[in-house]
């Protein structure tokens, strides 16, 4: 499932998925969060956890975070999460800022699209066992548009979030 929203690669719509994740964590479920955008901050979960009166420490033990600092690291994390899912029995897998990695100009376009297709096939396979949410934002370039086009056959659903008072959210 692609969840697209305002902000750089869906930065603002991430709050929605964080809320879903906190709810699952507070109920004793595990969550995998793969960060491809170098922006994951677990402290953003704390206010919602406190409001649900759940133990932050206990909840964070069930939050499995993977950070890919390069495209190849992100690819390895996505491939590996299938094996981890068998152990953790996670209720959701979040891939945050994935397409940002594929826009790196140092990666050849053919290689980039090939890795993207492999990642998407792996995630599509994972989605048979557990919901997979890919976060992204509005298209930023022609290459970004091409990458989204490559994603379409692999997506079961595509949701777009939009804030009513966009100017006030800045």
Regions found by a protein language model. Give the residues of each.
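Catalytic-core regions built around general acid/base machinery
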Residues: 20-23, 115-129
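Structural motif
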Residues: 2, 92-96, 133
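Glycine-rich P-loop/Walker A and Walker A-like loops and their local beta1-loop-alpha1 context
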Residues: 1-35
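Short, basic, glycine/proline-bearing loop/turn elements
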Residues: 2-6, 64-67, 108-109
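Conserved inter-motif catalytic segment of the P-loop NTP-binding fold
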Residues: 34-105
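Alpha-helix N-cap and loop-to-helix initiation/capping positions
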Residues: 107-115
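Phosphate-binding/switch region of NTP-binding enzymes
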Residues: 124-170
């Amino acid at each position: 499932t692609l969840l697209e929203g305002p902000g750089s690669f869906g930065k603002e719509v991430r709050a929605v998925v964080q809320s879903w994740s906190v709810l699952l964590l507070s109920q004793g479920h595990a969550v995998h969060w793969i960060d491809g955008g170098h922006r994951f901050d677990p402290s953003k979960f704390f206010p919602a956890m406190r409001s649900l009166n759940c133990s932050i420490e206990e909840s964070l033990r069930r939050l499995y975070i993977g950070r890919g600092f390069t495209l190849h690291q992100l690819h390895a994390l996505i491939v590996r999460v299938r094996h981890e899912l068998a152990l953790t029995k996670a209720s959701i897998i979040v891939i945050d800022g994935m397409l940002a990695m594929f826009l790196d100009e140092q990666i050849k376009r053919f290689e980039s699209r090939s890795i993207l297709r492999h990642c998407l096939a792996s995630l599509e396979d994972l989605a048979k066992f557990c919901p997979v949410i890919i976060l992204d934002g509005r298209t930023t370039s022609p290459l970004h548009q091409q990458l989204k086009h490559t994603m379409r056959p692999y997506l079961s659903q595509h949701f777009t979030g939009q804030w009513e008072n966009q100017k006030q959210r800045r």
